[in-house]
Amino acid sequence: MSMLDGEWAKAVGAEFKKPYYRDLYNFVRDEYATHVVYPPADDIFNAMHFTPLDKVKVLILGQDPYHNVNQAHGLSFSVLPSQKDIPPSLQNIYKELHDDLGCDIPNNGYLKKWADQGVLLLNTVLTVRAHQANSHQGHGWEKFTDAIIEAVNEQDRPIVYMLWGRPAQSKIPMLTNPKHLILKAPHPSPLSAYRGFFGCKHFSKANEFLKEHGVEPVDWQIEDI
């Protein structure tokens, strides 16, 4: 588990010394030793590695890493470029992007371009046992990622939160910064996308907010590979 550096280390480095994190570390280490676990251990903190704290302009909160082979690589909703099957929730995100901003629907689900522009693609739980959704919930990741969210909340500049579904929206009480914008919608899963995710226009709303406050908007178009 490659640790954090830079501003992230200053903001949440103390978490690594807390008893809950020691227990979490031991649990995750044992899981990797005895089961197939995703993402690869070196990718666990990719959301923070790709998006430094002082560059965050949007936070998209997911729940659990993808749990099938060759998918998860540490960014919520994103899959590796070699994965040609785009997960259903991401397909629906692309549909909304197409309807909202006219983005072409790409042939891959690799969202690193967003992360490189300041979109923090954070899951609340950072590891999962293969083919067992939610298998690493309740072991301490939630406490750690709450510290990440709190660090973002403390940033004194315009930031947009996209909170899709009830688990993500349960974090709203933590988000107290008046300079930040909270956008809520149902989850893009096929089970709920038609209840209000489609038509939410979060991507254009985020860019309008950023531009109004003098921040470079996000280029949401993912290119074909």
UniProtKB/Swiss-Prot annotation:
Molecular function (Gene Ontology), one example: uracil DNA N-glycosylase activity
Catalytic activity line of the entry: Hydrolyzes single-stranded DNA or mismatched double-stranded DNA and polynucleotides, releasing free uracil
Keyword terms, alphabetized: Cytoplasm, DNA damage, DNA repair, Hydrolase
SMART domains: UDG (SM00986), UreE_C (SM00987)
Location within or outside the cell: Cytoplasm
UniProt keyword DNA repair present: yes
PROSITE patterns, per database record: U_DNA_GLYCOSYLASE
Predominant location: cytoplasm
A GO cellular component entry from the record: cytoplasm
GO BP annotations, alphabetical order: base-excision repair, AP site formation via deaminated base removal
Protein's UniProt keywords contain Cell inner membrane: no
Its EC number(s): 3.2.2.27
EC class name: hydrolase
Active site residues per record: 64 (proton acceptor)
Family the UniProt entry places it in: Belongs to the uracil-DNA glycosylase (UDG) superfamily. UNG family.
Protein role: Excises uracil residues from the DNA which can arise as a result of misincorporation of dUMP residues by DNA polymerase or due to deamination of cytosine.
Protein name from the UniProt record: Uracil-DNA glycosylase
Annotated organism of origin: Agathobacter rectalis (strain ATCC 33656 / DSM 3377 / JCM 17463 / KCTC 5835 / VPI 0990) (Eubacterium rectale)
